[in-house]
Amino acid sequence: MSQEAFERGNWQAVIEAHPLESHDPEEWLRYGVALLQTIQPGPDVGKQQQQAALAFVQAQKEGAPVEAVAAEQRQAVMLSLAQALNLAGVDGAAQQASQRASWHGQRTTRLLRHPGKALIHTMHHLACSGGTVISKCLAAMPQVALVSEVNPLNRFGSDFEPTNPLLLLERSHRDLTIEEIKEDFLSRIAQAAKICRNDGVDLVIRDHSHTDFCMGEAPHQLTPITDFLTDQYDLVSVVTVRHPLDSYLGLIAQGWQTQFTPSTLEEYGRRYLAFLDRYQGLPLRRYEDFCTGPETFMQELCELLELEYSPSFLGRFGSIKLSGDSGRSSDSEIALRPRRPIPEEVQVELESSPAFQKLLKRLDYQA
């Protein structure tokens, strides 16, 4: 009852429905927010504020993490600000304050349901699918620290790795075991997460999924960003895709289709399907929708990833430098690109590839 009333903003109903004998920290947090929203000017203001403060103290006694209490208090502030701006007729600012309040509420819920686990946001996409420009736009959001193209199993980088002594040890001594790689990776992520927590920013990891699915003789069974992190961190993740033919033509333009064998459209279709199978159940969004409506797309993406959104990203993303700029000639323009010319042999494959046709149907793209 109090949850439904809370979502509707019926603060008095939340207060009336609150059981004072409750041991549910969420109930006490909702009660505290409702008390703050119903404070009226007058001689009893101090008493009302004290009652709300005691509700938050009780929530903590019932097991709510300090971070969850702080997030809910910030939500209360944003709700009050949104109401004041709305009354003043400043609709745009009121909407932004309301969105921030919703974001703080999301964060509270996650902190309560996954106590003791730091939150990490992850993005998964294949090469040449528009992931870099989308990632730049995410990195341009307030309070976001994005680490681009991460995969501890990748062994196709530069021979010069002065900042990675364990990889140098592997090259000069012996292959590392999966457990040794995992231990090193977790220690690095723990340090990154600690830095982000101390700086008050959200850590976003852009997975280099190309390593897992489009390199070598077969897709990997192990996907380390998810498989290594899921036990220790609370992951909130999304998948982005592009028309597979455009992605494949992008691979050909870079010469990357030779990184998997056989280097055919049929094989690419099989590997793309394996990628989708692995991340089935995650929210999936299209690059084409991003290009035709970047603000709407990014607002929705931030909601899915539980990140704070700001429309100011449009003026900032062009100055952000990330690895993976494989095909985009402009740093600040968001627009659909014309399809690259289709080689004759690819056209023949396109008409006769069962896996690729299955992929198009699954993603609801036309050939």
Spans of model-derived segments:
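Residue at a conserved register position within TPR or TPR-like alpha-solenoid repeats
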Residues: A5, L35-Q37, G42, M78, ...
